[in-house]
């Protein structure tokens, strides 16, 4: 066994083998994979092996497309048969609500290049899949790029291909401990000796928690029991094979919470049952391997009952075997991929429950990241940094149970899931709740979404719902008088030290503002793409406050920490809920603030983008003259023990102005009519500054060689490929939410990033990306919503305060 390697991959399942192979594709030869038993031990060997391209996140869908296209390559290179069955598949809808969801998936596929997707009738679905009862369904979607593979064959094809490219892998080699030297290298202690490595990849599957704990890391991963049954040979299968000349196609029956495919002369039926059960909640036994769990048919009986009704032939079939095996899940069901914050060269490739759809993409992204410093794709939906320190074992358990039980359930755009909540709250939570706040969870924190009158609550729908009118009241209150919003969920970072100014000048693409001033601050990757957008406030020569997206706190903190100088001249602190805040916004915002402080907050004394410390009554605060509403407004930041007092002061001082609380949904409506983008929607690491419109905040000519400068200049010279545009949409009873296709002259040319109803302006709006050549085209635009083409109008100027006069007043 080798005693030194550039990368050691821990875990010999499909994901670890894919990572190993992709490292060799990038020229790495000094790489090793370690497996405690045999390849595929754990979850891989008993998987159903299904593969499909459809995913709720379009960027993950692209990686799934890549995975499926990769199979021929590794089969040819390795000589290992992977037994691919490209049968095609149907997604079945038994209700109109589910059919609406399928129409959205179909629309998303159009801009992803999935041109072969079809929305079909139940009768057509029956022609493709004779085993269904078409009377049980209202519609379906057909995808020809769907099927299944042999888990053993795929894993060995990856491993053999990697070995042909120069890698090594060792079975029956158990990792017993990990330790890191001061120079950053790792000691990998195994039952066969020690290996020195530059990088560690945790692809340990069922043992991901154990490998994490070796370095003091508690990964948010939980294994769930998952069952599928295999039938005896069925005459209906033989008849369907003869009739169609091919295997029975795959099917997902969402309302039955089941999936089916052919297995030899019979069928396989798997369930995601409501009465789900975790497996080995605290730790995974090291001796577990090629073993199965005791099946519990009573637990899946409700799903089977629906399945037998929807697929009548199953009721007549004999059950040959019930497979019950554990699979790992993260709290939201997506993988945990990427570098771990605060650790040097420790990488995660865990919780990949759809390994035969996603394994290739995960391996590609992680190999790119290790070798090139960037995944090469937008992998936010899989990035381990999307979770914070709040994801302990109890939280993970609650969320994974919920996610598993809802895997085939509809998630409506206005639906907030309940598991693991409430967890983090501010001191004004009870006040907000008493005022009718309907909460959502953002990065673990309870955030008011909207305020409901007594007796009114969210009714989940693809269309405008019970919140619509009340969000409008909140938004109009901001525009007409004054509103008070909770911004405690924003991310807050302090940057201090003798080297803080110079460090920020390199980290951020903007000019560092003078003391007492703020600026909008794009942050770029090495290639010039956007990796963050912030507000930067200069409190003194060596003390700065950065405000950013709350959901990206770990993501951005990881970037900050990885770029800190080693001399101790810069300190970066993430405040989380140690600094909380409120925003006052609207034409009367200044009057309310002035009534609460002896400081002069007039326009002359505190103009737009000014910032300073001041006392608000008895509360010491940092106040910035800025608002995401695009109106006259302020952001007020305080220590958490002062938040209740601050809230009460503003509500009392604002009573004469009919101050109204507003939530995140009203804030979204207000920012849309200002053409403001947001992180995770309009601003993601696949877009450049020119494409996003953030180039106006990039100081291309400043002396500092900021990260991404060369790439940003190159994009400015070329013009990039895309443009972020705003549209007014001729919508009737529903509004876009994101990922709908944008067409011009009847051809799909772009995609929606976000949207909603701009209540104060009285129109439905969308933001999205289109080719730069079309960005000035005024007519011919349409956006697809619920399988209907809606006319849209390019909205170049903001609908509200186009010249920013009120925002700056």
Go through each PLM region and give its residues.
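Beta1/beta-strand and adjacent pyrophosphate-binding region of the FAD-binding site
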Residues: 2-15, 32
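Flavin-dependent oxidoreductases
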Residues: 18, 177-293, 302-310, 392-416, ...
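Glycine-rich FAD pyrophosphate-binding loop
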Residues: 24-44
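Central beta-strand plus flanking loop segment that forms part of the substrate or channel wall
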Residues: 48-53, 89-91, 217-242, 302, ...
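Dinucleotide-binding Rossmann-like beta1-alpha1 core, especially the glycine-rich loop
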Residues: 49-128, 255-260, 265-268, 401-413, ...
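Flavin (FAD/FMN) cofactor-binding and adjacent substrate-gating region
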Residues: 73, 94-165, 170-171, 176-184, ...
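C-terminal catalytic lobe of FAD-dependent flavoproteins
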Residues: 255, 264, 286-424
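Glycine/proline-enriched, intrinsically flexible loops and inter-domain linkers
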Residues: 377-378, 382-809
């Amino acid at each position: 066994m080798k005693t030194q390697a550039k990368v050691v991959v821990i875990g010999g399942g499909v994901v670890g083998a894919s990572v190993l192979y992709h490292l060799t594709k990038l020229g790495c030869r000094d790489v090793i994979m370690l497996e405690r038993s045999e390849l595929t031990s754990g979850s891989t060997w008993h998987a159903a092996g299904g593969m499909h391209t459809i995913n709720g996140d379009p960027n993950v869908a692209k990686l799934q497309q890549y995975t499926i296209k990769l199979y021929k390559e590794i089969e040819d290179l390795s000589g290992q048969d992977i037994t691919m069955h490209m049968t095609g598949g149907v997604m079945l809808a038994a209700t109109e609500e589910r059919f609406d969801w399928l129409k959205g998936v179909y629309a998303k596929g159009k801009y992803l290049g999935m041109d072969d997707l079809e929305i079909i009738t139940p009768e057509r679905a029956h022609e493709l899949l004779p085993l269904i009862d078409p009377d049980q369904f209202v519609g379906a979607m057909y995808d020809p790029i769907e099927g299944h593979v042999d888990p053993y064959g795929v894993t060995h094809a990856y491993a053999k291909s990697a070995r042909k490219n120069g890698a090594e892998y060792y079975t029956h080699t158990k990792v017993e401990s990990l330790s890191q030297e001061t120079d950053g290298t790792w000691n990998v202690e195994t039952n066969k000796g020690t290996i020195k490595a530059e990088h560690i990849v945790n692809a340990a599957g069922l043992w991901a928690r154990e490998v994490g704990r070796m370095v003091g890391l508690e990964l948010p991963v939980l294994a769930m029991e998952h069952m599928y049954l295999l039938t005896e040979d069925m005459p209906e299968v033989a008849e369907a094979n003869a009739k169609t000349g091919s295997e029975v196609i795959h099917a997902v029956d969402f309302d039955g919470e089941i999936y089916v495919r052919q297995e030899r002369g019979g069928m396989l039926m798997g369930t995601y049952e409501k009465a789900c059960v975790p497996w080995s909640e605290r730790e995974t036994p090291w001796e577990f391997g090629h073993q199965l769990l005791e099946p519990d048919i009573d637990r899946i009986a409700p799903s089977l009952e629906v399945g037998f009704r929807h697929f009548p032939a199953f009721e007549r079939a004999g059950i040959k075997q019930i497979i019950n095996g554990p699979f790992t899940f993260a709290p939201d069901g997506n993988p945990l991929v990427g570098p771990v914050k605060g650790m040097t060269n420790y990488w995660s490739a865990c919780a990949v429950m759809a390994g035969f759809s996603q394994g290739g993409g995960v391996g590609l992204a992680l190999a790119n990241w290790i070798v090139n410093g960037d995944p090469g794709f937008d992998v936010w939906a899989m990035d381990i940094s999307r979770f914070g320190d709040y994801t302990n074992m109890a939280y993970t358990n609650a969320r994974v149970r919920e996610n598993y039980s809802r895997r085939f359930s509809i998630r409506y755009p206005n639906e907030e899931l309940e598991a693991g909540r409430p967890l983090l709250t501010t001191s004004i939570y009870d006040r907000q709740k008493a005022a009718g706040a309907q909460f959502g969870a953002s990065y673990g924190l309870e955030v008011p979404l909207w305020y409901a009158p007594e007796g009114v609550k969210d009714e989940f729908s693809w269309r405008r719902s019970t919140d619509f009118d009340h969000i409008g009241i909140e938004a109009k209150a901001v525009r007409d008088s004054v509103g008070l919003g909770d911004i405690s969920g924003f991310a807050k970072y302090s940057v201090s030290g003798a080297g803080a100014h110079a460090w920020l000048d390199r980290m951020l693409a903007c000019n560092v503002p003078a003391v007492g001033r703020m600026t909008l601050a794009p942050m770029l990757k090495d290639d010039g793409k956007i990796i963050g957008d912030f507000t930067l406030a200069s409190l003194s020569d060596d003390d700065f406050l950065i405000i950013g997206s709350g959901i990206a706190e770990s993501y951005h903190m990881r970037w900050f920490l990885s770029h800190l100088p080693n001399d101790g001249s810069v300190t970066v602190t993430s405040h989380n809920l140690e600094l909380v805040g409120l925003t006052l916004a609207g034409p009367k915002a200044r009057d309310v603030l002035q009534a609460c402080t002896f400081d002069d907050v007039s326009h002359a004394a505190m103009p737009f983008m000014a910032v300073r410390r001041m006392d608000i009554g008895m509360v010491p605060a940092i106040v910035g003259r800025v608002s995401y509403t695009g109106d006259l407004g302020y952001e007020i930041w305080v220590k958490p023990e002062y938040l209740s007092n601050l809230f009460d002061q503003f509500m009392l001082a604002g009573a004469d102005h009919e101050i109204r609380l507003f939530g995140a949904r009203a804030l979204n409506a207000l920012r849309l009519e200002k053409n403001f983008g947001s992180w995770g929607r309009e601003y993601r690491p696949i877009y450049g500054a020119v494409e996003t419109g953030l180039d106006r905040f990039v100081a291309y000519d400043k002396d500092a060689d900021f990260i991404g400068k060369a790439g940003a200049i190159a994009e400015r010279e070329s013009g990039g490929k895309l443009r972020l545009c705003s549209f007014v949409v001729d919508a009737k009873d529903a509004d876009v939410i994101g990922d709908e296709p944008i067409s011009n002259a009847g051809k799909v040319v772009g995609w929606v990033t976000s949207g909603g109803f701009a209540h104060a302006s009285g129109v439905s709006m969308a933001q999205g990306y289109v080719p730069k050549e079309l960005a000035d085209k005024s007519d011919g635009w349409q956006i697809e919503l619920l399988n209907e083409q809606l006319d849209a109008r390019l909205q170049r100027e903001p609908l509200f305060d186009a010249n920013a006069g009120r925002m700056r007043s």
